[in-house]
């Protein structure tokens, strides 16, 4: 019996990153973790910066970093529209660590006109990239 799948498109502002049939998609929506599979109810949600994990039709997994965006689930198609999408293997761990350090330093030395919300967004993006890198390292170690 063939696995039940759904068509998934992951698109950034620059290009289509992934298009194909998947058994499942896991992302962090505005209300928490979302697991999308064949037969999921229609849904529209904001996506928080973080990891998107897909299980392809053949059972293999692929992991992406999403900087945020929108998830649309329809009966036969799932679309992820993200500002920035990076394959996990393309994330520069040192650059993410440096971005985290910079955001923390800005927050520690904040003045009266400091934009705390913008700093929190930058910190969240850096932390999300580092979580994706750690997930990949754990999967490789298995």
From Swiss-Prot:
Keyword Membrane (UniProt): yes
Subcellular locations according to the entry: Cell inner membrane
Keyword list, A-Z: ATP synthesis, Cell inner membrane, Cell membrane, CF(1), Hydrogen ion transport, Ion transport, Membrane, Transport
A UniProt-annotated Pfam family: ATP-synt_DE_N
Membrane topology: Peripheral membrane protein
Recorded superkingdom: Bacteria
Cross-referenced SUPFAM superfamilies: Epsilon subunit of F1F0-ATP synthase C-terminal domain (SSF46604), Epsilon subunit of F1F0-ATP synthase N-terminal domain (SSF51344)
UniProt GO cellular component terms: plasma membrane; proton-transporting ATP synthase complex
Annotated PANTHER family: ATP SYNTHASE DELTA/EPSILON CHAIN, ATP SYNTHASE EPSILON CHAIN, CHLOROPLASTIC
Subunit-structure text: F-type ATPases have 2 components, CF(1) - the catalytic core - and CF(0) - the membrane proton channel. CF(1) has five subunits: alpha(3), beta(3), gamma(1), delta(1), epsilon(1). CF(0) has three main subunits: a, b and c.
Cited function: Produces ATP from ADP in the presence of a proton gradient across the membrane.
Name of the protein this chain belongs to: ATP synthase epsilon chain
Gene name as annotated: atpC
């Amino acid at each position: 019996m063939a696995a039940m799948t759904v068509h998934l498109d992951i698109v950034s502002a620059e290009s289509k990153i992934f298009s194909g049939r998947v058994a499942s998609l896991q992302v962090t929506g505005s209300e928490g973790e979302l697991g999308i599979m064949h037969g999921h109810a229609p849904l529209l949600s904001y996506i928080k910066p973080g990891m998107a994990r897909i299980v392809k039709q053949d059972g293999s997994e692929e992991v992406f970093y999403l900087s945020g965006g929108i998830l649309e689930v329809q009966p036969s198609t799932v679309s992820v529209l993200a500002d920035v999408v990076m394959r996990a293997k393309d994330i520069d761990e040192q650059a993410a660590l440096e971005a985290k350090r910079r955001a923390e330093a800005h927050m520690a030395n904040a003045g009266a006109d400091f934009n705390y919300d913008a700093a929190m967004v930058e910190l969240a993006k850096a932390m999300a990239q580092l979580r994706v890198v750690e997930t990949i390292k754990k999967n490789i170690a298995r």
